[in-house]
Amino acid sequence: HKMDPDVILQGAIFEIITTDVNNVPIPASVFEEFDLMPGNRNFNYKKMIYPFGRRVNHWHKDASVPDMSRTETKMWFFYVAKRWIDMGLEAIHFGQVEIMDDRDRNHIHWRDVMARIRSYAKKHARRSIVLCDAHVPSGGIVHDGKLMFDLHSFPSRPKSLKGQPHKAILEKGFSDSIYGRSAGGVTPSGWSCESLPYIVEIDNFGNSDHAG
């Protein structure tokens, strides 16, 4: 920011939770945000995962998809977002939201935690705002005409060209690409659009396991 004060730095809170969270103390401010009595304890991995084994160990052993309907998960997301904002970051990517909402289909809990994060940013962020985005294979999350995110994001989904090695195109309708599918509505900032602007990621997955 000293070199370029207009730069927006982005952090992320992804669709993964590991047992490492058991080593992170919960600050009193996080308890208080959720109207809970502050206590001397760490975050609890088992209180964040889906019950009945759903999406548990989804990524690898002791690395699961968090369940946003659980208070502990909401506390974790608020805690990480707060740390990003306190560090001067002004944008947060929330990963694959639509695999963290299996028990929150109306996104009541997602909207609640997003509202808490935005409220904190309004008081503490560099420019009193945080821009939030996520991967949205559905095209976007909209309730009562209101978009949940400031922008959408998705992998670019390049389509290989038969007989033309090393060449690819970005094609509307190919695979689950977002082109032409980004939902519109009223943004968190209050302006309206027919299709929310989005980011496409050139390299979302790293190197291929079947190069060539």
Segments predicted by a language model, with ranges:
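Glycan-processing catalytic domains of CAZymes
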Residues: 1-212
